[in-house]
Amino acid sequence: MRVIVRTVSELCITVGALIVLFVAYVLFWTGVRADGAMNDQIDQLHRQWSQGSVRPTAAPGRKAAAAGEQTVAVAKPAPYRYGKAFAIMYIPRLGFTWNKPVLEGTGRDVLAKGLAHYAGTAQLGQEGNFAVAGHRRTYGDPFKDFPRLRPGDAVVLTDGTTWFTYRIDKGPYKTVPTDVEVIDPVPRKSGYTRPGRYLTLTTCDPEWGHSHRLIVWAHLDSTQSVEAGEPRALRR
């Protein structure tokens, strides 16, 4: 009997240790790997842009008097390639050091390396809905502080030639994973009623679950050439 009790106890200890190791892997190691992967993607983009290996997406235009920033006419970029980074996102509300790469596609392999652009939604700066997903927890926790986002917050992206500043209009809005209308070209639940240049960000809810989704919607507020310097939203 003692042998049986000892064996069961040892098995319980072993299983408990394995669970602890698994939790440590999920909480720590996936984050370390994801942070490294995201930094690598950003470094690669900066190298490409410094070498001029990016197709220009905009040409200088008039000055936006209210914002004091240059408005540019945005041309359609080349098609995005699955799993490849094409832009960097900045959200000052989440910290002035917060920056994440945006890659094409929403596969698990893509989400492990950064934010994921929903294939089939609008390209950056184009008419329609530029929709992006990101993990709330694990894999670097890119959208851990998603609930802090508020209307009026800036979401800034660059593709190496142009800065795009979006302004949040609504959210965070809670819904279910099957509610795919949130990334429609004109997402009605956002309050938008006509075509425009929109941005949708999505992540999981609750923080450690995935039974629901949190959504924010934004509109394109301004654009400017990278030669003009950082947009006002990124200036401290």
Model-derived regions, located:
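Extended boundary segments
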Residues: 70-119
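Beta-strand cores of secreted/periplasmic/IMS beta-sandwich domains, seen most often
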Residues: 23-26, 85-101, 150-167, 203
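N-terminal low-complexity, Pro/Thr-rich disordered segments
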Residues: 33-81, 193, 227-236
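Extracytoplasmic/periplasmic soluble domains downstream of a signal peptide or transmembrane helix
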Residues: 126-130, 136-236
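N-terminal membrane-targeting segments
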Residues: 1-47
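A glycine-rich, hydrophobic loop/mini-helix early in the fold
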Residues: 119-127
